[in-house]
Amino acid sequence: MLASAALCWAVALLLQPLRGRLDTESVRHPIRLSDLRTTITAVLAVRELRYLSFACFAFNGTQAVFVAYFVTYMTSQGHPLVAAGSLYSTVIAVAVPGRILWAWVGGFYVAPHLVLGGLAFGMAVSIGLMGAFTPHWPLLAIGAVTMVVSATALSWHGIMLSEAARLAPPGRTGAVTGGVLSFGQIGALSSPAVFSLLLGLSGGYSAGWVVCAVPAVLVGVNMFRQGKPVQQRNAL
């Protein structure tokens, strides 16, 4: 914990020289509750941003469920806590280069909405497969499936934010990305609660993992149904 706190302080200090160039808004800029409603309404009014918002909801929800329940799920399957924790930390590491990779692919080679659609279907299949785990599955096979989860459900952030920023009109990048991310927070708060409810009702984890895959499938369908990428929005 102390090391994590020290790292936060180090990052804060390293960012200080950039404040003069990036933090140009006046500290007296008024913050109104109506700004939240305006931002959400503006995001929902544009089809591409609406799709991104739902994707952020589904992706962040899936991520939150995986992070919250994976280790407990493994121990319920009879795996030692140390082994479950070690596997978790290993597969989580895949997300670090994954976030950079997908943003790079979407920025230079493949349309961003197609990359997001591929990530959606990838996380739907892999998170659904987690419901099929049994105590007889070898850790190597479990690791292979969960690495796909990490490479999809935990690696979407870079391309999601870059696409939201690209679609935002000039001067509204912060508001638009914030609006999209707000739906992600709703997913992160609600999805683990739904998973917990299904766990209590069914007495097992399988139903929760399968249901968790459904929003991702819908996102994949939405993304692949889109046509050519639109240009930057001039107004919302």
Model-derived features with residue positions:
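Symmetry-related core transmembrane helices of the 12-TM Major Facilitator Superfamily/SLC fold
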Residues: M1-L14, A207-F224
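Helix-loop junctions on the cytosolic side of multi-pass membrane transporters
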Residues: A12-V27, F224-A235
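Juxtamembrane intracellular "pre-TM" segments in multi-pass secondary transporters
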Residues: L18-S53
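Extracytoplasmic gate region of multi-pass secondary transporters
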Residues: R47-I100
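Interfacial helix-cap and linker-helix signal at transmembrane-aqueous boundaries
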Residues: M74-T75, V105-G106, F195-G203
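Helix-to-loop junctions at the C-terminal end of transmembrane segments
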Residues: G98-A111
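C-terminal transmembrane helical hairpin of 12-TM major facilitator-type secondary transporters
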Residues: P112-M160
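A late C-terminal transmembrane helix in Major Facilitator Superfamily
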Residues: A165-S202
